[in-house]
Amino acid sequence: FPTRRSSDLPVGYRVECGEHSVGIATDLGKYNEYIVGNLQNLDALLLEANHDIRMLQVGKYPYYLKQRILGDRGHLSNENAGRLLCRLLHDNMKGIFLGHLSRENNYEELAYETVCSEVTLGDNPYKSRDFRIQVAQRDCISEVITV
């Protein structure tokens, strides 16, 4: 499914096999109802949690790049990743991986804690502890889950 990223043919993925489905959603910028619809009822999801907004704002990137990252065609912040996740959670979701973290504008622990806080405090019936949420590692294989 197409995303809003500012590159050539940006896409997210939804892979289905029988009754099971997994999704990969990075380079989102902002999300809309179309993206939410493509990511609903997944068994597992790799979701972009690219940056902490404050770290990006005070970081070393030039102004134009900060504006692009924060814009509709940029990257999804930790906070917005958590808010999107609130709309996607359901009782049968088996795994959530946070990915595409910025090396300069994020920390694994910060992404995890921010997303978990958004889920726990968000407008949904779940708490973050109800799900296996983990940060996808850059340099090694993440936990393998069966869907």
Description of each model-found segment:
Residues 30:
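Acidic, two-metal ion nucleic-acid-processing modules in DNA metabolism proteins
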Residues 9-27, 44:
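Conserved beta-strand hairpin/beta-sheet module of binuclear metal-dependent hydrolase folds
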Residues 7-9, 129:
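Short, basic and Ser/Thr-rich N-terminal targeting/leader segments
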Residues 131-147:
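Short, basic/aromatic-enriched C-terminal tail that caps enzymatic domains
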Residues 1-6:
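Short, small-residue-biased leader/transition segments that mark boundaries at the very start
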Residues 24, 46, 135-137:
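Structural signal for conserved beta-strand scaffold positions within catalytic alpha/beta enzyme cores
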Residues 33-133:
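Cap/insert and terminal regions of metallo-dependent hydrolase folds
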